[in-house]
Amino acid sequence: MAKKITGYIKLQVPAGKANPAPPIGPALGQHGVNIMEFCKAFNAKTQADEGTITPVVITVYADRSFTFVTKTPPASVLIKKALGIESGSSVPNKNKVGKLTKAQVQEIASKKMPDLNAASLEAAMKTIEGTARSMGVEIV
């Protein structure tokens, strides 16, 4: 018989840097999950992407056990990484902070594809382009 699910926890944690401090500790603590066990498992699974913000969905069961699924980093993080910038523009329609080529957009879209609600790579590329435009990045 399947285990009874008592809750889901969604967090964005830097890859390889999970620790019991807030926000992870309190979120897991209120569900009775072993915090150190999660931190060790998460850090082991994400050590290749060290430092990149990684969304994670933790499923907590009635017996206080858990499973977790890591997602791909947010599109904005991937765009900033591709351009080597700290943050997007505060006035995106006036100040442009960089230029993204179609090839870079395609690479980011193919990386994000499993987590995007897009039927094709072209649709995923349009989603990424929209995110880039809202950050003040020009598509060339």
UniProtKB/Swiss-Prot annotation:
InterPro entries, sorted: Ribosomal_uL11, Ribosomal_uL11_bac-typ, Ribosomal_uL11_C, Ribosomal_uL11_C_sf, Ribosomal_uL11_N, Ribosomal_uL11_N_sf
Keyword Ion transport recorded: no
Posttranslational modification: One or more lysine residues are methylated.
Example of a GO cellular component annotation carried by this entry: cytosolic large ribosomal subunit
Any one GO molecular function term: structural constituent of ribosome
Signal peptide range: none
Keywords: Methylation, Ribonucleoprotein, Ribosomal protein, RNA-binding, rRNA-binding
SMART domains, sorted: RL11
GO biological process, one term: translation
Pfam family, one: Ribosomal_L11
Function: Forms part of the ribosomal stalk which helps the ribosome interact with GTP-bound translation factors.
Description of how the protein assembles with itself and partners: Part of the ribosomal stalk of the 50S ribosomal subunit. Interacts with L10 and the large rRNA to form the base of the stalk. L10 forms an elongated spine to which L12 dimers bind in a sequential fashion forming a multimeric L10(L12)X complex.
NCBIfam families from the UniProt entry: L11_bact
PANTHER family, A to Z: 60S RIBOSOMAL PROTEIN L12 (PTHR11661), LARGE RIBOSOMAL SUBUNIT PROTEIN UL11M (PTHR11661:SF1)
Membership in a protein family: Belongs to the universal ribosomal protein uL11 family.
Protein name: Large ribosomal subunit protein uL11
Origin species: Geotalea daltonii (strain DSM 22248 / JCM 15807 / FRC-32)
Lineage: Bacteria, Pseudomonadati, Thermodesulfobacteriota, Desulfuromonadia, Geobacterales
